[in-house]
């Protein structure tokens, strides 16, 4: 069974993330939604983010939600992931993720990265926008 790691801070996990995981679960054997701590961001409490993610994707079969505080490649090794899955909304996303892809390959040869474009209905959603809207009381 192929294990795919979908890593991120998911602050918060939104409908676009959930859609990506649902689609990946149909393609691959096992999906691990890896929720990261980050020394470069100030994400919300890890336990809260994990609980919210578990609730949001509870209906999806063969998906595990696991928190981690290491390099993504080290976590991929730990869970025996063969593939990293990333959602790509824009060319800017691709440029950044392409750099990460090459660094991950250098650190863990054989680790592949697969990009999925978002479903059209979620193509504009980002965690930053969700936090901004929530900050003003929007839903």
Model-derived regions, located:
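Nucleotidyltransferase catalytic core that binds NTPs
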Residues: 1-139
């Amino acid at each position: 069974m192929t294990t795919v790691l979908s890593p991120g801070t998911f602050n918060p996990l939104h409908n676009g993330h959930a859609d990506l995981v649902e689609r990946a679960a149909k393609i691959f054997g096992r999906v691990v939604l890896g929720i990261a701590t980050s020394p470069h961001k100030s994400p919300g409490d890890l336990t809260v983010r994990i609980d919210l993610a578990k609730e949001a994707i509870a209906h999806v079969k063969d998906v595990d939600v696991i928190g981690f505080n290491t390099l993504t490649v080290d976590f991929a090794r730990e869970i025996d992931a063969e593939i990293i899955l990333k959602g790509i909304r824009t060319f800017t996303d691709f440029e950044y993720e392409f750099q990460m892809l090459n660094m991950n390959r250098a650190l863990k040869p054989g680790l592949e990265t697969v990009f999925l474009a978002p479903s059209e209905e979620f193509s504009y959603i980002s965690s930053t926008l969700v936090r901004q809207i929530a900050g003003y009381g929007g839903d």
